[in-house]
Amino acid sequence: MAYPILVSLLMEQMIVLTDTAFMGRVGEVELGAAAIAGVFYMVIFMAGHGFCVGTQILIARRNGERRYGEVGQVFYQGLYFLMALAAVLFVACQMYADEILSMMISSPNILAKAEDYIHWRVYGFFFAFAGGMFRSFYVGTTQTKTLTLNSIVMVLSNVAFNYVLVFGKCGLPALGIAGAAIGSSLAEFVSLLFFIGYTRAKIDCRHFGLSRFPALDIKRQRSILSVSMWVMVQSFVSLSTWFIFFVYIEHLGEESLAIANLARNISGLPFMMVIAFASAASSIVSNMIGAGQTDKVALAIRRHIWLAYLCVTPLLLVVAAFPQMFIRIYTDIPQLVDAAVPTVWVMCSAYTVLVPANVLFSSVSGTGDTRMAFWLEMAALVFYMIYNTWVVYIMRVDVMWAWTAEIVYGSLMFAFCGAYMRRGSWRRRSI
């Protein structure tokens, strides 16, 4: 089950990697601005993504219980909520994003480029949120092969749109960083069209209750929110600390921010591998509990952790051995290539703890106890932010040492989530 999710997530990560690769050819300022604006967008986006994770847990549970007709109810009620949320977030970003960024970014050049990116990128909320609900459906019902096809379509669209809009091809003006934002939003629109067409053509919509649009059901909305709310808040807060981390690094200088963005994008491939196994573990845990197979949960989690290690470790060893080869994918600026090497090494070492931490954390959410998952991560993030504030903002260390914050975070999440799963109170929870 993890393989199609992995391919899907890797292809989605290619959206970010494509933007970075194009910006690395435009300039150092654009490369840094794409990093901080991209993370800012992701902070807002994660509210919707968190809701999708909550609906995925519910869809998986109903699928495991063989209550297939209720899957469509969860899907459509979730879709209604997400479209309303997308509208609210779109308006809020158009009104306040520039002001928020200006309070946090010290470089006028980076600020101007970041504002250009965000102005166009927020149009993607509507397409990305709707597409997220389709992913929740396919993962929750264990029909994950569809995600691979969809992601290939999205990535190819993004590459084409970026090439045309960033550099000004086919008679269009060169839009630079704004072109990357427009291209990403258009790629998400193409992805959504694919999901709609594929679902209508290949899925038994009547079996899953997808053949008709139900009326708005406030009671069911509350039921979904009772699970999703904690994931939404957790996702938003988690990415907010990541955004603050990049703001801290931006104050170290434009080069430091560019290096951090390079490390983030090189980390994207192994991170998506880990998240694929974590997402699969969450869905399988929820399905097992729904089917009354709680005694098999621990073994399933251990298997996903070791499989994640087996997939990620060879790649990380290659990256650590040939860091400059991977850095040059995203930039051809010589001083950045050399300066980013130590940071890439630290990033690779962090996966020793990030692999089990992410699988265990997703498994906690898969039990349905999303409130506990929220508090476990909040506890880890408190220490993470204390460490970041002291090491990066106050001590102003090199960006290489700043990246050790990931080791601190991963170690704490591994310890907290592992202790919760061993305790076993999740066996008695129903949703």
Which residue stretches match the model-derived regions?
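Hydrophobic alpha-helical transmembrane segments of integral membrane proteins
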Residues: M1, Q13, V43, A47, ...
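Short runs within selected transmembrane alpha-helices of multi-pass transporters and secretion channels
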Residues: C52, R121-G140, L147-N158, A180-I196, ...
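Transmembrane helical elements of multi-pass membrane transporters/channels
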Residues: M1-D19, W120, M154, A187-S191, ...
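Small-residue-rich hydrophobic transmembrane alpha-helices
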Residues: L31-Q94, A128-T142, T146-L147, I259-P323, ...
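Hydrophobic side chains within alpha-helical segments
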Residues: I15-V16, F22, I59, Y138, ...
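Helix-terminus/linker motif at the lipid-water interface of multi-pass membrane proteins
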Residues: L10, M14-G32, L101-P108, V164-L175, ...
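Generic alpha-helical transmembrane segments of integral inner-membrane proteins
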Residues: L6, L10, M14, T18, ...
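Short alpha-helical transmembrane segments in multi-pass integral membrane proteins
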Residues: M1-A2, I59-F126, L172-M229, V285-A350, ...
